Design a protein with these regions (language model features):
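Membrane-embedded alpha-helices of multi-pass transport/permease systems
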Residues: 89-108
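Extended hydrophobic alpha-helices typical of membrane-associated regions
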Residues: 132, 136-186
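Multi-pass membrane catalytic core of lipid/isoprenoid biosynthesis enzymes
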Residues: 1-30, 86, 105-147
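Intramembrane alpha-helical segments
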Residues: 2-79, 136, 157-167
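Juxtamembrane/interfacial segments around transmembrane helices
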Residues: 15-19, 55-64, 80-87, 130-134, ...
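Interhelical loop and helix-boundary elements at the membrane-water interface
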Residues: 1-7, 38-57, 103-124, 162-186
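Alpha-helical transmembrane segments
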Residues: 75-87, 143-150
Length: 186
């Protein structure tokens, strides 16, 4: 435990050193992100929605990158952040399917457990919302034509995950989850 605390403290020190290179707004957001990062591990004990909290936490970097570049927060970045949250909610629910039995035994909560009878539908809704939000954002901001190929590939990767995903087969769940490396790259 002592070594882990030293390691975590070292990482926090280096992260803070990097953070102070940015503008004041980004620094404030970076410090605020610490609440999310430290609270996330406890969410599985508190709520069936830790994947939503992961989405809020993991995608906070989108807002920070925007503020680092523009020194402002705008509707566009909040919309992109929201789309990424739904995407994370979907893919982490797929990942969590592999752990349902063990999580139920030890009393850990997740969206995978909450929606286990309708998991494919829940993930589909999450991905659908992410796609609709992204299409709306890109069409409004850039004109859909500029991003048609990338958005189409992203959409197809999410649809492929839904097709590949089988809650009764851990290997298929992991394969579907790993597709998100490609989806995120897009």
């Amino acid at each position: 435990v002592k070594l882990a605390l030293v390691y975590a403290s070292s990482l926090c020190f280096f992260a803070f050193f990097i953070l102070i290179q940015f503008n004041v707004l980004t620094i404030i957001l970076g410090i605020a992100s610490m609440f999310l990062a430290f609270a996330y591990p406890f969410m599985k004990r508190i709520t069936y929605w830790p994947q939503l909290f992961l989405g809020l936490t993991f995608n906070w970097g989108i807002v920070m990158a925007w503020t680092a570049m523009t020194n402002s927060v705008s509707l566009e970045v909040i919309v992109l952040y929201t789309a990424a949250i739904f995407w994370t909610l979907g893919y982490d629910t797929i990942y969590g399917v592999q752990d349902i039995e063990d999580d139920e035994i030890i009393g850990i909560k997740s969206t995978s457990i909450k929606f286990k009878k309708n998991i494919k539908f829940f993930v589909s809704v999450c991905y659908f919302l992410s796609i609709v939000i992204l299409i709306g954002l890109f069409q409004d901001q850039f004109g859909l034509n500029n991003f048609t190929i990338l958005v189409t590939i992203f959409i197809l990767s999410l649809i492929y995950q839904i097709i590949k995903f089988n809650k009764s087969n851990s290997k298929k769940c992991l394969q579907a989850f790993k597709i998100n490396n490609f989806s995120g790259f897009i």
